[in-house]
Amino acid sequence: MTSPLMNESYRKNLPGTALDYFDTREAVDAIQPGAYATLPYTSRVLAENLVRRCDPAALEASLRQLIERRQDLDFPWFPARVVCHDILGQTALVDLAGLRDAIADAGGDPAQINPVVPTQLIVDHSLAVEHPGFDKAAFERNRAVEDRRNEDRFHFINWTRKAFKNVDVIPPGNGIMHQINLEKMSPVVQVRDGVAFPDTCVGTDSHTPHVDALGVIAIGVGGLEAESVMLGRASWMRLPDIIGVELTGRPQPGITCTDIVLALTEFLRAARVVGAWIEFFGEGASALSIGDRATISNMTPEFGATAAMFSIDQQTLDYLRLTGREEAQVQLVETYAKAAGLWADDLAQVQYERVLQFDLSSVVRNMAGPSNPHKRVATSELAARGIADEGKLASGKLEQADGLMPDGAVIIAAITSCTNTSNPRNVIGAALLARNANRAGLTRKPWVKSSLAPGSKAVQLYLEEAGLLGELEQLGFGIVGFACTTCNGMSGALDPVIQQEIIDRDLYATAVLSGNRNFDGRIHPYAKQAFLASPALVVAYAIAGTVRFDIEKDALGVDAQGNPITLKDLWPSDEEIDAVVKASVKPEQFRKVYDPMFTFKVEHGAPISPLYAWRPQSTYIRRPPYWEGALAGARDLSGMRPLAVLGDNITTDHLSPSNAILASSAAGEYLAKMGLPEEDFNSYATHRGDHLTAQRATFANPKLINEMAVVDGAVKQGSLARVEPEGQVMRMWEAIETYMLRRQPLIIIAGADYGQGSSRDWAAKGVRLAGVEAIAAEGFERIHRTNLIGMGVLPLEFKPGVTRLTLGIDGTETFDVTGARLPRAELTLVIHRRDGSQLMVPVTCRLDTAEEVSIYEAGGVLQRFAQDFLEASQGA
């Protein structure tokens, strides 16, 4: 299935060019006349991939799955690219470096282990906002801290750039992978060996669908699946539900696309689109700019979906020109899209499994919070929802008069994330609001740590062109870096005085950010909750200083005549925003940023070793253990004890947090023993190349609720577990160490939507290294389920209506799993009670494909790689 260009009979000249393409319409209609016209956009792209890459013997059967909408069979997909950020991308390359060692140990040639598919690694997850936006040297200082803390990691990444073929690296300080993908890396239509075809990619981040806005299928996957694709293997899938979402109407004046996407997130969550591929269409969709479309597509994982596509149209071409793409490439996109039936006008007869309607004119000004992206709250309802509170606001003013912070203090206000900074309208809107606030004499509250972290250097250029960067800087929103920063939990340290006051007074402190996630504990350990909002609202909340403030009604200050100044007095008109965007955002800005960034130098120096020289004292990069000992041995699915019994909506932030490492944590204690000063502990995310540090992050979230951790008759929140049979509650890491010493196989019992959130492979690696053999839950998030399989952990799904509560599981039990492990087979979870009784519970084996069964039985993706490579080498 891996040989390229398999079905030459469908290879045709692309009209008006010297290139060829594969005529997918002919291939599909040869099976069922007229079928191509009814296929959704995504099915057409998947069909082209099959026609171009699939074994001819399997082509008709695979295409029939798309035509007949069959969801019971597997078919291969070969993405054109892999895009990575430096956390999961680095851990993937650490795994490949470890695989090279394993191959060398077995007598193979390690230099033969290379990515086959072009892989782009962007260093964007390492920068913490240690110096805020009101520090004029914040950018340089934050970059210096980033380089110092991450020397080990960057040394390894630099080695990979030279040691591996097909790996391009964008160094730190240049932007966010998704925004760079949107503005530069995606050509929309690829050309290789004289053949034009749709650009597609997988990315090691759940927000990879950001570039779906361009009509590019881009799917977020875990690091393990990305490794598989890198090495040239097909990504096997079953056809998902493809749901059409018709966007009608036009947004009301003053409504941003952030407001729209937060409303859409609530709407689509309620419509249960989990795992589906969404296609937006209709007059409302056609009128949205690519910036607005990207804001929507970015939050695909928050919808619960896999992809959120827009088709190619004039907006696409205009955006490609705006961002400095070559005119020949823009014309190729138009020519190919119209020839291949990917142009928006060619989709009138598409048939979807479901069609939903969403009226853009119904959207009001929104936020999301205080702890989930789909928990929308209209700003007009803040008081009714108990967030804005007149009494607490008055008390807070008295506290401020005494030099104290108010209840509900906004301690972090961050314009952050590709969700919004890739949308010029949102950035310019915030800057104009800042200008108006400055003119009115308003200022940021002194306890607010404010920051601006664009996902692209082009943002700085167009803000300067508009004369607005200084307006943001005046309010404390200077540029602190070009990276993910606060959105990824890298908000940096608070002022020590402010932090101590929060601790001493047990203050309810919050964050407001223009990001895409606000799970408890994600943004900062001392921000008890967080709200998502448009960049303009972030600026407004920095002025207000507290979430007890009714942002629509309360006065942000007074003018020279003593008249109250409210949000509507500061909010810029849509006409002004559009005029500034049109005058200030220019193609030459993008060319100035990206032309030098993507001119990769060929270095002719001393040959570099194919094996990495591991540093024994490193706490960032360490040879992985996945080919050694029990991890490479037989599975033991009997006598398992529960490590945790969990409720619904357990996120990968619960399973393996990304934010700052505290000195009191297990990881912090380990780093101190290794000689690191506390100020250089960095984040959990940055240490994921060292399993000895990273495994100590397993369930290290202080917001974890493990129902086994009962103290004085009540479940205690925290990184806690109960060791059985003693019944002793202790810190999670100590419990894991205890079970590891006993060689005790473990299981996790959980509720619905287990593993939602970031595509974090360490959420699976951590539990596997702890000795977890299986996880039984009411449901799994897609990426996390594949990561579990990639690590050799068996996902089991309870039947509808069966839960840990109906089964009365309290953690004293032991568990066996019996039955033949086949795709979606019914297995039996045998529960052994402490009183000697047994309960036989049917569960669904969530190894969904034959390929997943094969990976699991091999012990995981990495073990499977080694086996296949050595077998192929011996047979050569």
Predicted feature descriptions by range:
Residues 1-876:
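Fe-S-dependent hydro-lyases/dehydratases of central metabolism
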